[in-house]
Design a protein with these regions (language model features):
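Juxtamembrane segments of multi-pass membrane glycosylation machinery
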Residues: 104-125
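Transmembrane alpha-helix segments characteristic
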Residues: 151-153, 338-362
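Hydrophobic, aromatic-rich transmembrane alpha-helices
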Residues: 133-137, 314-341
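Transmembrane-helix motifs of polytopic, lipid-linked glycan transferases
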Residues: 126-149
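Aromatic- and kink-enriched transmembrane "portal" helix at the membrane-lumen/periplasm boundary
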Residues: 107, 153-176, 203-208
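Hydrophobic/aromatic-rich transmembrane helices and adjacent perimembrane loops
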Residues: 367-389
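Membrane-lumen/periplasm interface segments of specific transmembrane helices
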Residues: 29, 244-328
Length: 406
């Protein structure tokens, strides 16, 4: 009891410090004049407008399908919102025009726009994501073997990772998913004793930097990496299941409380009912219909889940996932241990997190399926990792015996 109370106090202190830091950083980011960035912002909006020549004003890359869509409309809103346009620093920092989100990306993007164009920012995005992608793949190969590295990388590629650098809206959650995974994979010895704080902070950072895009990516990938580390360390079913559930709860609390805090801070600083807007949007995104030019579209859990499954598991993705499951299944049958099945089930549970998200946020998941489908890459990685976990103890013991003999 005392241990849980202490952890709760640490998380509360972490949240308070994070909220103060977020608010201060946003105020600082909007403190310098628009003239410093107006030329680059104008050029960015012009480029996004030129690209957005598809139906609905969105831009498609490569395949000209909903699978590969980039949200240029929201990207234009992101770049236009970097300008104060006569607003006070406080109103601009709280984004009174779109107040229900933190818009933490402005802390990075606004200073960068002083010296960089949108083209150079996209190059920077690409280099950052590819560097983290390679680091995570290498560490998976080093720790768990080449098959796990293939599952990690393959799941992300199946979600069209390559398009993320070109869409500023997709960058924060993709970057945080990879950065969180890298923290777990590269710093496991230090992170394993602070996992609750790590996942709580990760959820908070996703809320701060991201719109409501595909947040489960930044929960599922780091969590699956952490659970695999625990399996390889010889942890039993009870601690692994405990971590599966409690780390997920910590992430959700970090995300949810940070979102509520934006409502409180925004309301206090701008004297607008930001909290009311957040609560009404939360209610709208979890239930009800949405409206198009042709009328109302009814939303159900089933329709939200199905449209995301149909978008993700198309063509090559079906074959790639089936091949990964087949290869891992053969290895599990030949070299696995059935007593590992409770640990494997914990990873299989993580594979269901995107589906649970679709059911809870059914309106958002149905309306924005062309980006929320990306969360199913968690299903690919965690599902294959569940089979991988069946053979972990035997392989780990063999490695240990070799090391002792050496």
């Amino acid at each position: 009891m005392q241990r849980s109370l202490g952890r709760g106090l640490r998380l509360a202190a972490l949240l308070a410090a994070a909220i103060c830091l977020y608010t201060g950083l946003l105020l600082a980011a909007y403190s310098f004049p628009d003239e410093w960035i107006s030329d680059n912002v104008g050029a960015a909006v012009g480029m996004l407008t030129e690209e957005g020549n598809m139906v609905g004003g969105y831009a498609n890359y490569f395949w000209h399908t909903g699978f590969s869509i980039t949200d240029n409309l929201t990207d234009m809103r992101i770049y236009q919102g970097l300008l104060r346009d006569g607003r006070s620093v406080t109103d601009a920092a709280m984004r009174t025009d779109y107040a229900r989100y933190w818009h933490g990306y402005a802390v990075v993007l606004r200073p960068l726009m002083i010296v960089m164009s949108i083209v150079n920012i996209r190059y920077l995005n690409m280099m950052a994501l590819m560097a983290l992608f390679l680091v995570c793949g290498w560490k998976c190969r080093e720790r768990f073997g080449w098959r796990t590295a293939a599952h990690f990388c393959g799941g992300l590629l199946m979600s069209f990772l390559l398009i993320a650098p070109f869409c500023q809206q997709y960058m924060p959650v993709t970057f945080l998913a990879l950065a969180g995974s890298a923290a777990v994979l590269c710093g496991w010895k230090a992170a394993r004793n602070r996992l609750y704080e790590l996942f709580f902070l990760l959820g908070s950072l996703v809320c701060f930097f991201d719109f409501l895009t595909f947040p489960v990516l930044a929960l599922g990938y780091p969590l699956a990496c952490g659970l695999l580390q625990m399996v390889w360390d010889g942890e039993g079913p009870a601690p692994i299941w405990k971590k599966t559930l409690l780390l997920s709860v910590a992430w959700v609390l970090g995300y949810g409380l940070t979102w509520v805090a934006k409502g409180i801070i925004g309301t206090l600083l701008t004297e607008e009912n930001v909290l009311g807007d957040i609560l009404s949007q939360a209610a709208f995104r979890t239930t009800g219909a949405f409206y198009t030019d042709t009328g109302a579209v009814d939303v159900s859990m089933r329709s939200a889940v199905l449209i995301n499954l149909e978008t993700f598991f198309m063509g090559a993705n079906i074959g790639a996932f089936a091949l990964m499951l087949l290869v891992e299944g053969v290895y599990a049958l030949r070299r696995g241990r059935l007593e590992n099945w409770p640990q494997a089930l914990a990873l299989a549970a993580v594979a269901l997190w995107p589906v649970i998200w679709y059911c809870v946020l059914q309106n958002h998941s149905r309306l924005h399926f062309w980006m929320t489908y990306k969360q199913l890459s968690v299903t690919v990685f965690a599902g294959c990792s569940a089979l991988r976990a069946l053979g972990a103890v035997r392989e780990d013991r063999s490695c240990g015996e070799v090391q002792k003999r050496a």
